[in-house]
């Protein structure tokens, strides 16, 4: 969807799967960026945000949730724009302020996240002025129990984060650690439907206008996961491997096995869903799945990401 269909004062910096999209808001209420990508792209994020702001300062950094691909650029942006304020969802504010890594998701998935400063929390259930527009802040549990979405009602623009993509939604992380959350996904999809957005800016991928079709696809995927939670768990394990390969490009087999064996979320997935499969065999089977899908190449002791 061409960016010129977004109203003035909202710019989408479309990234990829390693880094979330960044949404730059400018206007009479100052300037803000919503979500900041992954740590290894932090310098690029700073450059992209500077370019989008032109000569303006960055006043506010907003995170829809604290997964590493959505807040990994926070520290770099804080260093580049020291007067900026960082607002996060309230559910993880205490853990982030004290930097209790065991309570933040990146430690369990073996991902990178530089520590950043927390200046305040988003007003869930209320509105916040960012750039030219007023944004309503809604709770959007499911993908993450503390996630929020932001909706600008004047132009019906929705920043959906990972609650809704054009083709699905993000992994349902609470389900992966034994907490029921498929009902929360369903409730969030119903909330999005009730807002009737004219434009959806997802956490990954281009903005899109056909929310109804995206919701239908998301509900179909949710039904499949409800029917077979093991399918969701296996998909999650593959996604974790692929995400790390997007970061590294290539991996020595020994280094991969060290990372895999230490990842707490993978340990939990195996114990919960795949305990009948020996750990080394399960690990190898996941690589074979990814190779069969054309996502990676195996060459001797190297594991290589394929674009």
How would you name each of these model-derived features?
Residues 1-5, 294-297:
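Short, exposed beta-strand/loop patches in secreted or surface proteins that constitute
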Residues 13-15, 117-119, 139-141:
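Short Gly/Pro-enriched turn/cap motifs at secondary-structure boundaries
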Residues 41, 120, 180-184, 278, ...:
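Soluble or luminal CAZymes and related metallo-dependent hydrolases
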Residues 4-10, 106-110, 131-133:
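Short Pro/Gly-enriched beta-strand edge/turn motifs at strand-loop
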Residues 31, 38-40, 134-229:
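Metallo-beta-lactamase
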Residues 40-43, 50-130:
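Active-site HxH/HxHxD metal-binding segment of metal-dependent hydrolases
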Residues 233-307:
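C-terminal regulatory/interaction regions
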Residues 2-56, 149-162, 166:
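Conserved beta-strand hairpin/beta-sheet module of binuclear metal-dependent hydrolase folds
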């Amino acid at each position: 969807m061409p960016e010129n269909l977004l109203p003035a004062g909202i710019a989408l910096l479309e990234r990829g799967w390693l880094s979330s999209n960044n949404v730059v808001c400018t206007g009479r209420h100052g300037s803000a960026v919503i979500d900041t990508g992954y740590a290894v792209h932090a310098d690029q994020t700073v450059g992209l945000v500077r370019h989008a702001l032109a000569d303006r300062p960055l006043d506010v950094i907003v995170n829809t949730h604290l997964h590493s691909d959505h807040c990994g650029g926070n520290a770099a942006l804080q260093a580049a724009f020291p007067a900026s304020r960082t607002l996060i969802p309230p559910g993880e504010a205490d853990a982030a302020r004290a930097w209790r890594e065991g309570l933040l998701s990146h430690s369990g998935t073996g991902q990178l996240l530089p520590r950043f400063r927390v200046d305040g929390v988003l007003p869930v259930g209320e509105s916040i002025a960012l750039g030219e527009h007023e944004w309503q802040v809604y709770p959007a549990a499911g993908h993450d129990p503390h996630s929020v979405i932001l909706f600008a009602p004047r132009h019906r623009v929705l920043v959906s984060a990972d609650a809704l993509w054009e083709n699905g939604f993000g992994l349902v992380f609470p389900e992966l650690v034994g907490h029921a959350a498929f009902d929360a996904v369903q409730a969030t999809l119903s909330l999005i439907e009730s807002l009737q957005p004219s434009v959806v800016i997802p956490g990954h991928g281009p903005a899109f206008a056909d929310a109804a079709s995206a919701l239908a696809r998301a509900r179909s995927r949710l039904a499949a996961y409800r029917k077979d939670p093991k399918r969701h768990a296996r998909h999650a394990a593959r996604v974790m491997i692929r995400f790390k390969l997007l970061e590294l490009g290539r991996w020595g087999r020994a280094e991969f096995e060290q990372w895999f064996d230490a990842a707490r979320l993978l340990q939990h997935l195996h114990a919960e869903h795949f305990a009948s499969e020996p750990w080394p065999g399960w690990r190898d089977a996941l690589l074979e799945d990814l190779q069969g899908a054309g996502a990676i190449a195996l060459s001797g002791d190297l594991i290589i990401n394929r674009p």
